[in-house]
From Swiss-Prot:
<dbReference type="Pfam" id="PF14698">
    <property type="entry name" value="ASL_C2"/>
</dbReference>
<dbReference type="InterPro" id="IPR009049">
    <property type="entry name" value="Argininosuccinate_lyase"/>
</dbReference>
<keyword id="KW-0963">Cytoplasm</keyword>
<dbReference type="GO" id="GO:0006526">
    <property type="term" value="P:L-arginine biosynthetic process"/>
</dbReference>
<protein>
    <recommendedName>
        <fullName>Argininosuccinate lyase</fullName>
        <ecNumber>4.3.2.1</ecNumber>
    </recommendedName>
</protein>
<keyword id="KW-0028">Amino-acid biosynthesis</keyword>
<dbReference type="InterPro" id="IPR029419">
    <property type="entry name" value="Arg_succ_lyase_C"/>
</dbReference>
<dbReference type="InterPro" id="IPR024083">
    <property type="entry name" value="Fumarase/histidase_N"/>
</dbReference>
<keyword id="KW-0456">Lyase</keyword>
<dbReference type="Pfam" id="PF00206">
    <property type="entry name" value="Lyase_1"/>
</dbReference>
<dbReference type="GO" id="GO:0004056">
    <property type="term" value="F:argininosuccinate lyase activity"/>
</dbReference>
<dbReference type="InterPro" id="IPR022761">
    <property type="entry name" value="Fumarate_lyase_N"/>
</dbReference>
<dbReference type="GO" id="GO:0042450">
    <property type="term" value="P:arginine biosynthetic process via ornithine"/>
</dbReference>
<keyword id="KW-0055">Arginine biosynthesis</keyword>
<comment type="pathway">
    <text>Amino-acid biosynthesis; L-arginine biosynthesis; L-arginine from L-ornithine and carbamoyl phosphate: step 3/3.</text>
</comment>
<comment type="similarity">
    <text>Belongs to the lyase 1 family. Argininosuccinate lyase subfamily.</text>
</comment>
<dbReference type="InterPro" id="IPR000362">
    <property type="entry name" value="Fumarate_lyase_fam"/>
</dbReference>
Length: 491
């Protein structure tokens, strides 16, 4: 059979090199199922609008279901994309007088935009579930370690005592924002461009609301020119994925550092480690290292999308074909990374004794000591900061005698004469006491962490309901579509 796309206007066939250069068939594997679903919905609507006959609709629908059953490998890969290849296969099965009517009132421009949105919508739903699982694992682990002391860091230097729960919840909080960003992006992806045709809509009396309903989209992307030419939703999603991967890379970096001999805070499960081909003692955190590296894939995809979409005039341009593979590569990477991270966190062994011992290394209680000077003696914080800084230079545990000596240099009088006692100093230098004092919202005090974790669990319950609602809407739409398809096949 001659090429159904080129036979009228173009005489020369494309040679293999040009075909390989222009073809999107490999990337279109991502949208094969979506294309079938979009064709089903469009065909149903064509019948309902009286644009095609009932018997033709029945044959087209049966042919499409047969193609879905056969799979993509049965299609002719000599076509430049999945849409024409699929239509060609349908025409082979039911004849052009029937199959050739399916594309009425439609262009590949609105078709591909709809397929991309349909597929990406499913990927975003899966990603929401996976982020949810990772957050839930972090919250569960935090509940077990609300009193597990550890050093907090700034500049990778020991800074102040905190708890492992507080640290884990910092990551969970960031992932919560990632979850929100994915939800926000979902709402803009979940719009239907079908019916926009090439860009100026169509003279056929299409019912765009009907195909929107059959495909489970939240609304229409109304302006037909914008509907086919815009890929800002891809850029938005790629940005969201990059942000998420950067947050995951921060956790991965800490897992690499914490599992080192120098830190020994945790041990990764063997499943997530490798060994050396020459050094038999090695247990390398390769999975976490790869996650850092794969962050570059997502960031690179975002940069590619921005560059491809820059400066394109309205409406559709073939450049956009090069945009789509970037989003599939990015979403595949980010979803796998979230799943792998959840497994690493869930299975890692925590070393509480090491964490507790390190919580006081490097004079981590210095801030609380300065705060105690302020609270108990009334001196300005900046003055207290200077006194404690002088004590820190000595690299020895501060005593009352050393404190008074330093304060006399700075103030000309001892702090003991202003009411400071040894018990106050002892309390200030105790990391557990440090943490218990930090009970304002967001602090690491066990009682505050209990309240915080309770709120996070409530939020997770709400998020679970939100995911379920989105899935139910889409599942119901597809069930309805398939029900209508089965009804219309019976002629």
């Amino acid at each position: 059979m001659s090429n159904i796309l080129r036979r009228g206007r173009l005489e020369a066939a494309q040679d293999e090199e040009i075909l390989r250069y222009t073809s999107s068939m490999e990337a279109d594997r991502w949208i094969f199922n979506a294309d079938i679903v979009v064709d089903l919905a469009h065909t149903v609507m064509l019948r309902e609008q009286g644009i095609i006959k009932e018997e033709d609709c029945s044959k087209i629908l049966s042919g499409l279901l047969k193609i879905r059953e056969e799979g993509m490998e049965k299609l002719d890969f000599s076509y430049e994309d999945i849409h024409i290849s699929l239509e060609s296969r349908l025409i082979d099965m039911v004849g052009e007088d029937v199959g050739g009517r399916m594309h009425s009132g439609r262009s590949r421009n609105d078709e591909v935009a709809t397929c991309i949105r349909l597929t990406l919508r499913e990927e975003l739903l899966g990603l929401l579930e996976e982020i949810f699982a990772l957050r839930k694992t972090l919250v569960s682990l935090a509940e077990k370690h609300s009193e597990t002391l550890m050093p907090g860091f700034t500049h990778l230097q020991h800074a102040q005592p905190t708890t492992l729960a507080h640290h884990l919840c910092a990551h969970e909080s960031a992932l919560g924002r990632d979850f929100d960003r994915v939800q926000d992006a979902f709402s803009r992806v979940n719009l239907c461009p079908l019916g926009a045709a090439a860009f100026a809509s169509t003279g056929f009396n299409l019912n765009r609301k009907r195909t929107q309903e059959l495909l489970g989209f939240e609304g229409l992307l109304e302006n037909s020119m914008d509907a086919v030419s815009s890929r800002d939703f891809l850029i938005e999603c790629a940005s969201v994925f990059s942000n998420l991967m950067i947050n995951l890379s921060r956790i991965a970096e800490e897992l690499v550092i914490w599992s080192s001999s120098e830190f020994n805070f945790i041990e990764l499960d063997d499943m997530y480690a490798s060994t050396s081909s020459i050094m038999p003692q090695k247990k390398n955190p390769d999975t976490a290292e790869l996650m850092r590296g794969k962050t570059g894939v997502s960031v690179g995809a975002l940069m590619s999308l921005l560059t491809i979409c820059k400066g394109l005039p309205l409406s559709y341009n073939r450049d956009l074909q090069e945009a789509t593979p970037n989003i599939w590569r990015s979403v595949e990477t980010v979803r796998a990374s979230v799943r792998v991270m959840e497994g690493m966190v869930k299975t890692m062994k925590v070393h509480p004794d090491v964490l507790a011992a390190e919580s006081i290394t490097g004079f981590t209680t210095a801030t609380e000591l300065a705060d105690t000077f302020v609270r108990e003696t009334g001196i300005p914080f900046r003055t207290a900061h200077q006194i404690v800084g002088m004590l820190a230079k000595e690299r020895e545990k501060p005593t009352m005698e050393k404190i008074d000596s330093a304060s006399e240099v700075v103030l000309g009088e001892s702090l003991s004469s202003k009411g400071l006692t040894e018990n106050m100093v002892k309390e200030a230098l105790n990391p557990e006491s440090n943490i218990k004092r930090r009970k304002i919202p967001g602090g690491p005090a066990p009682e505050e962490m209990k309240n915080y974790l309770s709120k996070r669990k409530t939020e997770l319950e709400l998020n679970a309901q939100e995911i379920a609602t989105l899935k139910d809407i889409i599942d119901s739409a597809f069930e309805n579509l398939l029900s209508v398809v089965e009804e219309y096949r019976k002629i």
